[in-house]
Amino acid sequence: MQYKDSARLDSSQVTSSSGGGGAGGKMAVGGIGGIIIVLLAMFLGFDPGALVGGTAAGPQQSTDDYAQCKTGADIDTNRDCRFVAYTNSIQSYWSQALSGYQPTTTHIFTGQVSTACGTATSAVGPFYCPSDRIVYLDTGFFDQLTSQLGAQGGDAAEAYVIAHEYGHHISNLTGV
């Protein structure tokens, strides 16, 4: 994928955290079990954190790892800046295409993360939590996609996955 070197990036739309599991007593939920719990929470209106022993919490150990991502040229020296570019592009599109669009953030994590939907591990893959309206992404997912599943497409595939998660945000905002 080609990036315009002069493109300005807004790193405030991307946050990150690493490790940790949030409040004590929580159990990490991943894979199909995690998806089922989140779906049940969405349809039945309950806190999935109650099922795994604890109350829901927001992202822990938040850092500003993306502050150095200022322009498209920064992607050449720091590949992680591409997540800022994807997020900025997706938010720009929806801000123009959907009247009343409410921006959200992409939260990059490693290992596991506590969300308003409960604690999730990298086994869950990228997901959107409607309770806190945040897109969550463990970048190791893309490595796994390539190494274990043979996926190809590079940056375009990554952007597609993130855009898909933002689609859940749009559904949440519009009630569809």
Please tell me what each predicted stretch does.
Residues 54, 112-138:
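Catalytic zinc-binding patch centered on the HExxH motif and its immediate surroundings
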Residues 141-160:
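Short pre-active-site segment immediately N-terminal to the catalytic Zn-binding motif
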Residues 52, 148-149, 172:
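Short, solvent-exposed loop/turn and secondary-structure capping segments
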Residues 67-92, 99-120:
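Acidic helix-start/capping segments at beta-turn-to-alpha-helix junctions
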Residues 110, 139-141, 174-175:
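A mature extracytoplasmic/lumenal domain signature
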Residues 27-30, 135-138, 169:
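Structural recognition of the beta-strand scaffold that forms the well-ordered cores
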Residues 39, 94, 137, 160-173:
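Active-site recognition of the HExxH zinc-binding catalytic motif
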Residues 1-68:
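Long amphipathic alpha-helical segments used for membrane anchoring, targeting, substrate engagement
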